């Protein structure tokens, strides 16, 4: 991508929905060429996902990294993205990514971004909507990319 004539390698961002959002966790943390990250309906703590989601969506537990809770949880992975701009959006009724874990992740990331002196580079939005990149979420993502790229 960065070698294309129509791409500015200093202006590459990433967005992901659901499991694609989980891919943003790792890509954003590990790939320095990504300048901005957006996650849609793809964030909660592993703890909440395992305890609250498993009875409904046990087929999705393949996203769980065995043994990870001995070392940390979702917020610890996402903290590695800082201080890059990160926007996380979720919905209140998301059974795939429980709100209890989403709130914990966001609270901890607010502290991380503040410690970096960059609280404006982290934002989270939660709405009463569906598990999708809705027009509202898509518009918010577009504004975030335009602001930071």
Whereabouts are the PLM-identified features?
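Short beta-strand/loop motif that positions the catalytic acidic residue
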Residues: 81, 88-90
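Mobile cap/lid helix-loop segments that gate and shape the active-site cleft of serine hydrolases
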Residues: 35-78, 83, 96-106, 114-118
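Gly/Ser-rich "nucleophile elbow"/oxyanion-hole loop immediately N-terminal to the catalytic nucleophile
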Residues: 1-18, 34
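C-terminal catalytic histidine-bearing segment of alpha/beta-hydrolase fold enzymes
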Residues: 61, 107-149
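Alpha/beta-hydrolase-fold catalytic nucleophile elbow
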Residues: 15, 40-41, 89, 127
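Conserved hydrolase catalytic core segment
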Residues: 29-35
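Glycine-rich nucleophile elbow surrounding the catalytic serine of serine-hydrolase chemistry
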Residues: 16-26
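Acidic catalytic loop of the alpha/beta-hydrolase fold
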Residues: 92-97, 131-132
